[in-house]
Amino acid sequence: MIEVLIGLGAGVVGVGAGYLYAKKINDANYNIFLEQAKAKAKAIEYEAELTLKNSKISVQEAEFEAKKRYDDKTTKLQKEYASKFDELTKKEKILLNEQELLNESKELFEKDKQDAKVTYEEGLNLKATYQNKVEEAIRVLEHAAGLTEEEAKEVVLKKVEEKSRADIAHIVRKYEEEAKREAKKRVNYILAQATSRFAGEFAAERLINVVNIKNDELKGRIIGKEGRNIKTLEMVLGVDIIIDDTPHAIILSSFNLYRRAIATRVIELLVEDGRIQPARIEDLHKKVTEEFEQSIQEEGENIVMDLGLNKIHPEIVKLIGKLKFRASYGQNALAHSLEVAHLAGIIAAECGGDEKLAKRAGILHDIGKALTHEYEGSHVDLGAEICKRYKEHPVVINAIYAHHGHEEATSIESAAVCAADALSAARPGARREVLESFLKRVEEIENIAKSKEGIKQAYAINAGREIRVIANAKLINDDEAVLVAKEIAQEIESKVQYPGEIKVSVIRETRAVDFAK
């Protein structure tokens, strides 16, 4: 029990001691905390005082900056105001000066207006006075001259007109002479350029062709038994065949280039083949004629292509090819037309014209010469008619007419063709007048024979001293053939001038053909 009590007492004492100790420690901690709190409070108070002091300084600086900006802006505005005020003052002075000038001008204008009015009135008075004096002078002049005013005017105007005409004529004549001199220089230059730039071939047609043969024995075969082959050849081909002592040569003579060319080819084929007989001659003649017709078309197409032309009707192209077998005064018609085409193109180009159109007109200017005697009219009219029919360019038609003076040249291209034609035809040696007159005479003889009814063909041979006429046996009998020969001879005598005499031979042949089957 006692032990228990002692233990309790010890525990109470321990508890009390612990309480006292804890209280003491607690009091010590409180004092420390209190001191710390006081220190913090002082620090906060110091910071607050420092912040307040800084705030006062910032406010003072802000007030100072604001005042400074205000002062600067005020000073600037005052300066701008002063500048604008000065400017307005100057403008006001200018306006005042202008107003004064305007007022002065107005006063001067009013004064001038008044003076002008006075002057105008004085002018009217002077005009009236002048008019009166003029009328009085006219009356005096009329009385002195015995003329009315209108008559006097007419006399004066007539004299003025005569003088003016004389002056104008002198000036016109002067400029015309200058223009002609310049034109002549220009034309000479252009023609010189054209002739120097074009180098064409010279083509003079002959009246004979020569066929070379390997040996003279062939001459006998060509003549044939009793001359049958050579007679058939001359009748079918329409040419003179001259077989003489000239070695290795047979001469074909005809004024017709086309017939002569066909005859040359036929005899060459006969000589090459060796079969020379009448039937073979006729077959070859038909075949070669067809080949020549085809070659004529091809020749025309080649010419058109070489000249760079297009859209030419095939019939006109064929006529161009036929010009190869036509001649004028000994000059080949196709060579002449080509020469004219090239020269006309060069001349037109130099003058600022259409070179292609000039070439077209040049190649077609003598196209009428390609037509045979069956068509009536001059080659100019025939050529123009053909070109109109196939709707050729109007310049081409004008050139056809103009190159023989039937019309005036209406374009540069037509004039170029006329000049080129003159250059080609009129140059020395280009044509032979005597030959042309002979060819025309022979052609006229053939045409007289062909004009008779019932005549199939007619050929002038022996240099025009003989004409062989092939009659249609169904239309002309033997008795009528004699009469036809006499009629032809009489018409030749009356219409053709020729030396010596002309033999007229009318040949009538009847053939009966049948086939054994």
Swiss-Prot record:
Keywords linked to the UniProt accession: Cell membrane, Endonuclease, Hydrolase, Membrane, Nuclease, RNA-binding, Transmembrane, Transmembrane helix
Entry's EC annotation: 3.1.-.-
Q: Name one GO molecular function term.
A: RNA endonuclease activity
Give the SMART domains listed for this entry: HDc
Its record classes its membrane topology as: Single-pass membrane protein
Enzymatic class:
hydrolase
Q: Where is the KH domain?
A: 207-273
Q: Does the keyword Hydrolase apply?
A: yes
Q: Name one Pfam family in it.
A: RNase_Y_N
- Bilayer-crossing regions: 1-21
Q: What are the recorded Gene Ontology BP terms?
A: mRNA catabolic process
Quick one: where is this thing mainly located?
membrane
HD domain residues: 333-426
GO cellular component terms attached to this protein's record: plasma membrane
Cysteine pairs bridged by disulfides in the record: none
Where it sits in the cell: the answer is:
Cell membrane
Nuclease: present as a keyword of the record? yes
Q: Which family does it belong to?
A: Belongs to the RNase Y family.
Query: According to its UniProt entry, what is the function of this protein?
Result: Endoribonuclease that initiates mRNA decay.
Protein name, entry field: Ribonuclease Y
List the source organism. Answer: Campylobacter concisus (strain 13826)
The encoding gene: rny
